[in-house]
Amino acid sequence: MAKRIIYNENARRALERGIDILAEAVAVTLGPKGRNVVLEKKFGAPQIVNDGVTIAKEIELEDHIENTGVALIRQAASKTNDAAGDGTTTATVLAHAIVKEGLRNVAAGANAILLKRGIDKATGFLVDRIKEHARPVEDSKSIAQVGSISAGNDDEVGQMIAEAMDKVGKEGVISLEEGKSVTTELEITEGMRFDKGYISPYFATDPERMEAIFDEPFLLLTDKKIALVQDLVPVLEQVARAGRPLVIIAEDIEKEALATLVVNRLRGVLNVAAVKAPGFGDRRKAMLEDIAILTGGQLITEDAGLKLENTKLESLGKARRITITKDSTTIVAEGNDVAVKGRVEQIRRQMEETESSYDKEKLQERLAKLSGGVAVVKVGAATETEMKDKKLRLEDAINATKAAVEEGIVPGGGTTLAHLTPELEVWANSNLKDEELTGALIVARALPAPLKRIAENAGQNGAVIAERVKEKAFNVGFNAATNEFVDMFEAGIVDPAKVTRSALQNAASIAGMVLTTECIVVDKPEPKDAAPAGAGAGGGDFDY
């Protein structure tokens, strides 16, 4: 494949053109009066979105070099999304502003490496200042405010997320599902829940709702397939004597053993149900161990030298209540808190050690199931297009609230960055010199960009609004929904400090990379194949 090689100013200008295109497409969504973007899909209906990173992922340009610019700035959005889950549009607008300012200086002959160093130092200073200005999130009102701002000023969503956070705690998991109705609902599960139901519908104790509900049951946990009913007989006899129900969670139960259990259940000899173990491979074993710790039992596994036929009542777990439907099982246990705490710490350590985001997510789920519980938000909408948009907004809102709990909140609406401009200018003038100082001042000039854009999307003059905000106290900003200057904390217009910080760091990082680019190597577009010879001649006339 032949390559095109472009140097110096031409290279940077080509990147800039790509960045301009992407930034403009994303920036129209910023703020309470931001517009939507329609994305054409190869299959199905077009998607209407208001989410920066989703729009960025869709943009592909014909020109290879401009497309490289798009890919670079897209990285600022997706990295911010990975770190904080929101703030992708802010990151894009900021990166664009820093690149614009920086390229002007590079074109005038400034040393790009020193500029980048200045940009990095300025970013470090700003990150510390954001940390100092952040207020911890103490009540569910603040959480609701963060949630509703991220969901596009939807107070109902904010309340719902605050309620979910309240119930499941900081460690809990809030997951999203597509609901069946027009309204968005919140469902909170107490205890541990996993996505496996009873193996046979004959285990249902409530035939009307097709649920099996057991109070004060014993729990037999094993990671092997139960093939012979003889293995189970000793346990079944002990449980029958104790007069309590039994729930078996195993890798699988073969037909013969299953038939025996069903017959005993139907004859009323023993109140029993069997469920397949959740997960697969090593994760399955870990989840079974979690359940064992939660219920104060033992996992019957041959690795530990334990055999089914030798199992005693003491090895069985105990729960307050177990509810089993055809596709899920919920265990409510008042287990031994000390063991559960130890297990939670162990999972936390694993989370710190792992690099994979998939593993982290799975460990977080296990942590939530052990320590808090799980809240499910069922997203409701009239059409599928609206449903997808709502789901993206809700995802942002949930991520933003988690980020707020982690690092606190700062005034929203681009206010924090605009107010930090004068502080950065003072610090840079006294601590940096020459081109490093120029680099820091590039960042200072770019900081009000998100606020300007929010004001412009609301039909105001961005530059004027930004100047007026800078004159006011730190907490005072521009409320674009009402076109007024208000105390942002009182008005509930707040951003998580983590989102503002991540957006700034990723924007500065990508902008620094673009400014220090001196050469681009891209694939040469392949010439379109000419029509094969003779194909065009007399194409319409056939001799039969």
Swiss-Prot record:
Keywords: ATP-binding, Chaperone, Cytoplasm, Isomerase, Nucleotide-binding. SUPFAM superfamilies: GroEL apical domain-like, GroEL equatorial domain-like, GroEL-intermediate domain like. It is an enzyme of class 5 (isomerase). Its EC number is 5.6.1.7. Forms a cylinder of 14 subunits composed of two heptameric rings stacked back-to-back. Interacts with the co-chaperonin GroES. Together with its co-chaperonin GroES, plays an essential role in assisting protein folding. The GroEL-GroES system forms a nano-cage that allows encapsulation of the non-native substrate proteins and provides a physical environment optimized to promote and accelerate protein folding. This is Chaperonin GroEL 1. It comes from Trichormus variabilis (strain ATCC 29413 / PCC 7937). The lineage of its organism: Bacteria, Bacillati, Cyanobacteriota, Cyanophyceae, Nostocales. The gene is groEL1.
